[in-house]
């Protein structure tokens, strides 16, 4: 009886989720931190197309800042609750153009002297569709530069996990956006 009920609930809910994903090819993350804030839009025209990630982040120190999709859309303990980089294939950390990388590894964004980073990234691993969708996960901008998995010496071990990008300056849950 329980399994029958579970099956009925599942059959009622999941088609609605799939339908919502098919209706919108856009997602949005509103980033919030103590000083840093921003809005990031992700657009993907079809499952086979690359995702386009665009937006603006304010309040950063001038220079490069690690920019990643993290595993969880959880902010109960600030950005720490977002967990590690989104890595469904169990790879080591890398840059956005590396052959080996986490799905969530988007490299760095660069803030100008005004503390603003204009984001425009096209990525072939980020997806709004299927089992590895980034919807419901977190977008995180870090306080420091991502070394793209190229750290050496005493920095090599952490580089393979996080890119040594430092503290999480701001984060936001990636949510379905209204269709345009």
UniProtKB/Swiss-Prot annotation:
Q: How is the cofactor bound?
A: Binds 1 copper ion per subunit.
Pfam families found in the cross-reference section: Sod_Cu (PF00080)
- Record's InterPro entries? SOD-like_Cu/Zn_dom_sf, SOD_Cu/Zn_/chaperone, SOD_Cu/Zn_BS, SOD_Cu_Zn_dom
Q: Which GO terms describe its cellular component?
A: cytosol; mitochondrion
Q: What is this protein called?
A: Superoxide dismutase [Cu-Zn]
Enzyme class, top EC level, equals oxidoreductase
Tell me which EC number(s) this protein carries.
1.15.1.1
Q: What does this protein do?
A: Destroys radicals which are normally produced within the cells and which are toxic to biological systems. Required for normal brood size. May be involved in regulating mpk-1 phosphorylation downstream of phosphatase ptp-2 during oocyte maturation.
A Gene Ontology biological process in which this protein takes part is: removal of superoxide radicals
Task: Please tell me whether the keyword Protease is annotated for this protein.
Answer: no
Q: List the disulfide bonds.
A: 79-171
Could you name the domain of life of the organism this protein comes from?
Eukaryota
Q: Which cofactor does it need?
A: Cu cation; Zn(2+)
Q: What does the subunit comment say?
A: Homodimer.
**UniProt binding sites for Zn(2+):** 85, 93, 102, 105
The signal peptide stretch is 1-19
**Record gene name:** sod-1
Catalyses which reaction(s): 2 superoxide + 2 H(+) = H2O2 + O2
Indicate which residues the UniProt annotation says bind Cu cation.
68, 70, 85, 142
User: Keywords of this protein's UniProt record, alphabetized?
Assistant: Antioxidant, Copper, Cytoplasm, Disulfide bond, Metal-binding, Oxidoreductase, Signal, Zinc
